[in-house]
Each structure stands twice: as structure tokens, then as C-alpha cells.
Amino acid sequence: MAPSLLTEDLLSNTFLFHENLNLPIMHNKRSGTTPKLILFIASTKDTAGMNIAKQLIDHYNFEKLSESFHKNPVYSKTFQNKETKLLFINTEIVDTQFLGDLFNPNLLVFLSRHSSASGIPTLSVHTPGNLSEAKFGGTPRNVSISPAAAMKNALLEMAKLKDERGLDYEVSYECTHHGPSLNVPAMFAELGSSPKQWKDSKAAEVVAHAAVAAVSECSNCSVALGIGGPHYNKKFTKLALTTQRAFGHIIPKYALPQVDADIIKQCVERTVGTVDSAVLDWKGIKGEHKPKIIAALEKLGVHSERV
């Protein structure tokens, strides 16, 4: 077993071994303790993810360990007294539901490509999970825990560096979508939106720095749920970049026909930190959906505001 994953009291942990790996997996059973572990995940099937991972290794001097995962090397680095592991998987990144059975990290950051028909160069962050059916990984009507502060930190770093380096990229939140649906804080840091951008080493470096920024604390953040508007919500993005607001889950207009009070409750409860408010993109919500949203938020005691 790798010493780097051990805690002081071995009796408080259970170690499992996943098929095709020799990396010990820790589940901490000691009441009130959480392993200080951050995971960065990239898929060998993902050009952008591998590009971002290379930038992490090159710019942050990640150490190659003797461990392996999915028959791939494992890298490690300590940030702010938090052990950070960089792992490579051989499946598509949305098909990683199995990770929830293996790890219990403080934060899991997926390094990923972003694809869109528009092809607009984009740097983005979002929480994975399914607001309705599970078309692309994960489980139906089940969202991951949203690390709102971590995503805000990553978004801020993306915006700062792309301006400093003169990169012609949009920076944006995306709504909560696709798998996996994990019971740990999880986020995607993405580079897109076409193969040209996936291979852009300068943009990949920005995403790598953003992933590291996600590890930082954000004690002054005001955590919010976003509802309404498009898949890429410029209003929510601007609020996060110019105020203390940090968005966790974002429910877009197109998902609202399938969203009910239970999903809204889940999005509030499955967010790191207390959700102080729900920000409603009022013009981006059909009139027929507004009453159920307001009623659900009132029942939860969550203040709402319109933008």
C-alpha cells in the first residue's frame, strides 16, 4: 500500500483494490474525519483532458509514483497541505460512476474537453449530474455534490489568465449536466469547443492553473443556486466574476419541464456550503414553470432574487 494514502490510524480505514490497478483506495470510517485528498481525473480518450494533465505535470512538478490506476501512472503533488492525485482512466470521462465506490475525496476535478456545435473557443466549469434521465453517464435524477467555491475560484482564474495572455476564449459556467452522479464534491474544468482548441497548449495551461485554483479556500463566498436561462448563462457568470456570489448547481430553461420540487431540493442540499439564495434568470424561465419554482424555494426557506 502506498504510504501517501495512509492515515495515522490504519484501523479506521478500509482499503479496496479495483480491477486493473494497484492503487489502494481509502474509505475513512472514523466519525468526524475526512481524508485531505484532492483528485484530478483525465481520460486517455480525451485529447483536451490529456493536454490539461500534461500542463499540470509540467508546470507544477507533479511526482510520478510507483502506484498505477487503470494501468496508467499516478502523479502526486501537495497543495495547501492537501494531497492531490492526478489519475488517468481508460473510459470516457462521463462513464466514471465507479469512482464513487473507490474514493472519498474532498474534491474531484475532471479535466475534460468541451464540445459544442458552435465551435466557440470556451473555458468552462460545471457540476456533473442528471436533472432528469441519464443519457450520458451517471444515474437518473441524481446530481453530484456541487463545490460552488471551487468552481468560482477556477472560473476567476480562467478569466484572469485568458485576459492576461490575450487568449480569444469565452469563460463561462455551464449548467449541471451529464454523468457521473457522485456523492462527493465534483466539478468539470473544460477546454473547447472543437479539436483545434483541445490541442491548444496555451489554453490547456490556463485550465490547469484553474484546476489548481479550485483547491483554494473561498471563505467569503455567498453560495447560490442558479435557475433559468441558457446552457451557458452569462448573467450567472458575470455575477460570479464581479461579486462574492458562487454558483453551485445551475438548472437551465430547457431542463425545467422535467424538474420538480424534489430536484430543486436535491440541488440545494447537494451543494458544499449553505445555499444562501436562488438566483432566477427571470426572463429565461417560462411562465408556466415559475410558480413551481417559487413554491419549492419557499418550502425550502431559500430566498430568491431575479436577474
Would you name each region that the model predicts?
Residues 9-183, 194-195, 201-205, 212-234, ...:
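N-terminal catalytic or cofactor-binding beta/alpha core of small enzyme domains
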Residues 186:
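Hydrophobic "anchor" residues on beta-strands that sit immediately upstream
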Residues 233-242:
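Short glycine/threonine-rich loop-to-helix capping motif typified by GTGT followed
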